[in-house]
Amino acid sequence: MKTPLTEAVAAADSQGRFLSNTEVQAASGRFNRAKASLEAAKALTSKADSLVNGAAQAVYSKFPYTTQMEGSNYSATPEGKAKCSRDVGYYLRMITYCLVAGGTGPMDDYLIAGLDEINRTFELSPSWYVEALKHIKANHGLSGDAATEANSYIDYAINALI
């Protein structure tokens, strides 16, 4: 899994050199932000159920047709609603993984790589997930550096969808 730190080490090693001062300073900065990232990951994990449920409700409110149309990609049935929550939860889980890893590697490797194909195959609208992520961002309850760290990965996911 790639993170800025692992990429810096790999680049230096492939060039047969030590890390530069700039690379060491970047690593130091990452470790300084790590506490806030871990705090955010812990908070998002502990609030995951309520955040996911609220995000799904935000999708249903903005896109009411999702609860009215029949089909496996809609939320007209309890099974459909469970799938929506599962998918929103997957995005949130990827965000927490990125917070722990200190980079977008988990999201790049496990989510974004096949995102367009998944959405096309199952006729899922990216706008549903953008709305869900906006709800999570607005309601996660984080502040300060923890919020900054979490919001950066939420924004990364949103930008991947649009």
UniProtKB/Swiss-Prot annotation:
This protein's record includes keyword Transport: yes
Cellular component GO terms, alphabetical: phycobilisome; plasma membrane-derived thylakoid membrane
Subcellular location: Cellular thylakoid membrane
UniProt modification remark: Contains one covalently linked bilin chromophore.
SUPFAM superfamilies noted in UniProt: Globin-like
Binding site for (2R,3E)-phycoerythrobilin: C84
UniProt entry keywords in alphabetical sequence: Antenna complex, Bile pigment, Chromophore, Electron transport, Membrane, Photosynthesis, Phycobilisome, Thylakoid, Transport
Superkingdom of the organism of origin: Bacteria
Keyword Signal: no
Membrane disposition: Peripheral membrane protein
Pfam families reported in the protein's UniProt record: Phycobilisome
Membership in a protein family: Belongs to the phycobiliprotein family.
Role: Light-harvesting photosynthetic bile pigment-protein from the phycobiliprotein complex.
Self-association state and partner proteins as the record states: Heterodimer of an alpha and a beta chain.
The protein's name in its UniProt record: R-phycocyanin-2 subunit alpha
The organism of origin for this protein: Synechococcus sp. (strain WH8103)
